[in-house]
Amino acid sequence: VDELFNESVIQREYRLIGDELAPMLIQGGYPAAVAAQNPRVLRRWYRDYFQTVTSREVRYILQLGDSERLNDILRLMFGETSHLLNIQKLASALGFSRTSIETYIAASERLFLVDKIPAYHPRSYQRHIRSPRHHACDTGLALALESYDDTTLRQRREVMGQMLETMVVTELLKHASCAANETTCEHYRDRDGYEVDVVLRQGSRVVGIEVKLSQSVSSTDARGLKRLRTVAGDDFQAGYILYDGRYRIQLDDSIHALPLSAILT
């Protein structure tokens, strides 16, 4: 993370992830899951883990009394991972009150099943959207609950893109916790349609990160980062588009394309 702020990420040849991406997303990051070799065993482990955590923790620690309600909410949230969370949409889909949805979302955050990413608020710009994004805590868990395998995931590019962004956010949260300076993970979106997947913030200094499910990148992909650079002003340190390539490429002033493997492996 500190290298991202200093624009000092090592310039070298990185490895392509390519066809390894789908299996990587399906496997997720839990140590017990990483050790599983059989896809069916992997899915079973994730489902058992999910059931154990939600039923035990909801009943005995959170004392909410209804683990099935939490299960239903989490399944829908996992399907919307990386998106702005529409609480009213969840409430309508499940027939729950808005208050109940908010209570169970807070519970899912306490159980570390969901990561809440707040919105970045530029000091001099008022057209930003304040809604947070929510990410599944682990791509393997989210995909196991929907029975995705390697073949079906490759056929759903939109889902792969969502899960890739979620995996990047998970990794950045880990790196941020070890950074030399206190670092928060936020996101940016405004009413003009510009958005940045991740905004790393150290004090007032910010770095923008976009995640792209592609092996190529161009300066036109940097429109969100350029808007962030404008609204953040002198606080903007650098912007990166993560892509499945081999080299770091400068696209614009303080904006670079950076291989995914620099973050994920």
Regions found by a protein language model. Name each.
Residues V34-V206:
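Accessory nucleic acid-recognition modules appended to NTPase machines
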Residues S177-C178, R227-D235:
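Arginine/glycine-rich "motif VI" loop of SF2 helicases in the C-terminal RecA-like domain
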Residues R189, K212, L242-Y243:
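Short beta-strand/turn micro-motifs composed of small residues
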Residues Q215-L225:
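Active-site-adjacent loop/helix micro-motif of nuclease/hydrolase catalytic cores
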